[in-house]
Swiss-Prot record:
The RING-type zinc finger domain mediates binding to an E2 ubiquitin-conjugating enzyme. Coiled coil: none annotated. A lipid is attached at G2 (N-myristoyl glycine). It comes from Arabidopsis thaliana. Residues 23-35 have a biased composition (Pro residues). Pfam families: zf-C3HC4_3. The gene is LUL4. This is Probable E3 ubiquitin-protein ligase LUL4. Pathway: Protein modification; protein ubiquitination. One of its GO terms (biological process) is protein ubiquitination. SUPFAM superfamilies: RING/U-box (SSF57850).
Amino acid sequence: MGISFSNNNRRRDNNNRRHLHHYPPPPPYYYLDPPPPPPPFPPHYDYNYSNYHLSPPLPPQPQINSCSYGHYHYHPQPPQYFTTAQPNWWGPMMRPAYYCPPQPQTQPPKPYLEQQNAKKVRNDVNVHRDTVRLEVDDLVPGHHLVSFVFDALFDGSFTITFFAKEEPNCTIIPQFPEVYSPTRFHFQKGPGQKFLQPSGTGTDLSFFVLDDLSKPLEEDVYPLVISAETIISPNSISEQSSVHKQVTQAVLEKDNDGSFKVKVVKQILWIEGVRYELRELYGSTTQGAASGLDESGSGTECVICMTEAKDTAVLPCRHLCMCSDCAKELRLQSNKCPICRQPIEELLEIKMNSSDEQH
């Protein structure tokens, strides 16, 4: 009996071929050297640059995808940025920007106060503002007469007007002439005279509204205006006569008993074409009201140094309270009145001798 090896071998080869798998050849690989690592950072020293300005933040960088080279995975590094406080090894050394430290804030200087000297002006006629009254006319019921005390260096005249306003060149214009026409009265020179409006020339205040009598109306229309005027004769034929005028503007307030009280608001001087507005100075006496000083010498010391006579007034509060030396020091240190603590806008120095005849 013979054994055939050819069939067995063929069967074995077929079984072997059945279990073999054919794979495609591997693709070619490209082996590249990895990129060198970046140089190490230099040692960093923590300096306190609190006063230095740091560089602005970096702009956003575009996204960079990683690449695979063979068996090595390489992630590209973003470019290195250095602030001004770090050295750049790929370029020149960048120094930090030095700035001067902020200076301490200083207080603003005190406002400069202007100091002026008072100008002496002779007033030929003066109506004492605290003596102006309204008296009832006994002969004409319901009518009131104007009275006051005045001083005059020359002869002149008074003009009494109800509800009048001041126009250019100190001209007084009545607003209701049909109700009360202005009345003019002459006077002679002399000090301390009392004027009383003649009976029958008064006015009936019932024609006016009480609210209109107690305050100035629009465009500075005052309920009561007293104009005192003197005319100085020229010394020669070529000279013109000079008109000096004092205007007293007042309001009328009614008391509970029905009587009227006069409150003077403003007094104006018109001398040789120049307009002056009279203001009372607080701290002066009646005798020294014109010059701003008390002739008796009492109560005239400066409120700051308490030794020198006070000769400087504070505007607009009109407190006569300092000497000229203290006023010069005060205007460099403060702008507050030492009496009422209101802001000072101007200082008025008044230098008058007791022997001066002009007031």
